[in-house]
């Protein structure tokens, strides 16, 4: 398979720079102004088949179940996010999109699939638009962790699969949860990383642990998955488990990034047999068979502590406790009303690890009289990003639920992808 890499001449870049600069400035303002409205909708409705948009939720229609293809019509200009997949669009006008999903194994040449310098960074989408010029940006989700500074964003490429083969394009910019494709062409597309030759391959990724139990009066069965943080992949696993009456337990993902390709050991406090005990953190496209560990817990009369340890360095990377009360054999109760304050409390460690620049958040909290000038300076004086985050979270938690609600609202406006990501993990 040929790999022609798309390129733009210096003259083209120069001639287009002025116009595109003005457009991008306007588009960035659209994202900023609509983010508040969009993320407020996260509190109200979080259905899988809905985009969050500037004027509320927009339904997604399944038009071909056999190919898992969807259609959506955006009624106005603005920024739209599909939390179930992490896919986002910035549009200039009314537009109709058709969205399908592909498998890397079916389209990526075999010699590249097993080449140590290439790494799949996210799902593969088949996107068409009518009219195409109405779409200003596509935000393609990825699960590569940028927070440790170990990944060079120049490694990110958008792979387009066309009749002539795979065409590679550099994204306009790379953000913590997505890469931006400006003035997009439409095709089967996804994110690939081309690692510099000679680079030691140890790529940190955000990951997720999924635990499902299968009720039985004599012997409750558990399945535990360790997978990249791909919302679409999680949904596909949910659907597959649901076919066999599996019920997902709410758990937090690992706080720190895990290394792609590393091996991890699953253990438990009850000395129950786990098969297999070892899981490799790898990416398999949605629709492919996903690896998991399985164990049986009898009638589950005592709590079970589960742990995942990195095999090479014997480092504990994740643990949780499953209690008998968590296993609901009866009908599921109605979910409680969403609370921004509860969200911040429950995700303290995740927010501490993942929140970025706090300048805008601190300004919001000072404007709303949650923080004084002295308290704001105290946060800013902390030496590291995580210590700044922890200082802020601890300080606001002491001020009560109203302060936490205002903090949640500010984080939603400033970093909607982070809030969407954390909400998706808890579904």
UniProtKB/Swiss-Prot annotation:
- Major localisation: cytoplasm
Q: Which Pfam families match?
A: CARD (PF00619), FIIND (PF13553), UPA-FIIND (PF23679)
Say if the entry is tagged with keyword Nucleus.
yes
Q: How is its activity regulated?
A: CARD8 inflammasome is inhibited by DPP8 and DPP9, which sequester the C-terminal fragment of CARD8 (Caspase recruitment domain-containing protein 8, C-terminus) in a ternary complex, thereby preventing CARD8 oligomerization and activation. CARD8 inflammasome is activated by Val-boroPro (Talabostat, PT-100), an inhibitor of dipeptidyl peptidases DPP8 and DPP9. Val-boroPro relieves inhibition of DPP8 and/or DPP9 by inducing the proteasome-mediated destruction of the N-terminal part of CARD8, releasing its C-terminal part from autoinhibition.
Q: Where is this region: UPA?
A: 187-336
Residue span, FIIND domain: 51-336
Family matches, as InterPro entries: CARD, DEATH-like_dom_sf, FIIND_dom, NLRP_Inflammasome
Q: Name one GO molecular function term.
A: cysteine-type endopeptidase activator activity involved in apoptotic process
EC number from the UniProt entry: 3.4.-.-
The record describes the protein's role as: Inflammasome sensor, which mediates inflammasome activation in response to various pathogen-associated signals, leading to subsequent pyroptosis of CD4(+) T-cells and macrophages. Inflammasomes are supramolecular complexes that assemble in the cytosol in response to pathogens and other damage-associated signals and play critical roles in innate immunity and inflammation. Acts as a recognition receptor (PRR): recognizes specific pathogens and other damage-associated signals, such as Val-boroPro inhibitor, and mediates CARD8 inflammasome activation.
Q: What is this protein called?
A: Caspase recruitment domain-containing protein 8
């Amino acid at each position: 398979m040929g790999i022609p890499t798309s390129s733009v001449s210096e003259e083209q870049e120069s001639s287009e720079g002025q116009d595109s600069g003005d457009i991008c400035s306007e588009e960035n303002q659209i994202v900023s102004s609509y983010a508040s409205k969009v993320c407020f909708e996260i509190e109200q409705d979080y259905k899988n088949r809905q985009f969050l948009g500037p004027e509320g939720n927009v339904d997604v229609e399944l038009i071909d179940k056999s190919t898992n293809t969807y259609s959506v019509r955006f009624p106005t200009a603005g920024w739209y996010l599909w939390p179930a997949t992490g896919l986002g669009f910035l549009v200039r006008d009314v537009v109709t999109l058709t969205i399908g999903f592909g498998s890397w194994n079916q389209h990526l040449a075999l010699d590249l699939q097993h080449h140590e310098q290439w790494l799949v960074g996210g799902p593969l989408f088949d996107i068409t638009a009518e009219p195409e010029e109405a779409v200003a940006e596509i935000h393609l989700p990825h699960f590569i962790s940028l927070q440790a500074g170990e990944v060079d964003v120049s490694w990110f490429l958008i792979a387009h699969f066309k009749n002539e083969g795979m065409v590679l394009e550099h994204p306009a910019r790379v953000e913590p949860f997505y890469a931006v494709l400006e003035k997009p062409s439409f095709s089967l597309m996804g994110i690939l990383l081309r690692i510099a030759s000679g680079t030691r391959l140890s790529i940190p990724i955000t990951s997720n642990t999924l635990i499902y139990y299968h009720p039985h009066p004599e012997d409750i069965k558990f399945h535990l998955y360790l997978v990249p943080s791909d919302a679409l992949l999680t949904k596909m696993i949910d659907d597959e488990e649901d076919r066999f009456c599996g019920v997902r337990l709410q758990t937090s993902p690992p706080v720190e990034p895990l290394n792609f390709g590393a091996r991890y050991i699953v253990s438990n406090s009850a000395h129950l047999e786990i098969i297999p005990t070892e899981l490799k953190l790898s990416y398999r496209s949605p629709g492919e068979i996903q690896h998991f560990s399985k164990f049986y817990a009898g009638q589950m009369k005592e709590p079970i502590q589960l742990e995942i340890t990195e095999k090479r360095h014997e480092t504990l990377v994740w643990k949780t406790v499953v209690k008998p009360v968590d296993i609901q054999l009866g009908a599921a109760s109605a979910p409680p009303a969403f609370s921004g304050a509860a969200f911040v409390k429950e995700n303290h460690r995740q927010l501490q690890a993942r929140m970025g620049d706090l300048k805008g958040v601190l300004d919001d909290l000072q404007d709303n009289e949650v923080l004084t000038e002295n308290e704001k300076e105290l946060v800013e004086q902390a030496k590291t990003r995580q210590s700044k985050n922890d200082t802020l979270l601890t300080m606001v938690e002491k001020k009560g639920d109203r302060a936490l609600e205002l903090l949640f609202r500010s984080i939603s406006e400033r970093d909607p992808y982070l809030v969407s990501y954390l909400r998706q993990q808890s579904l």
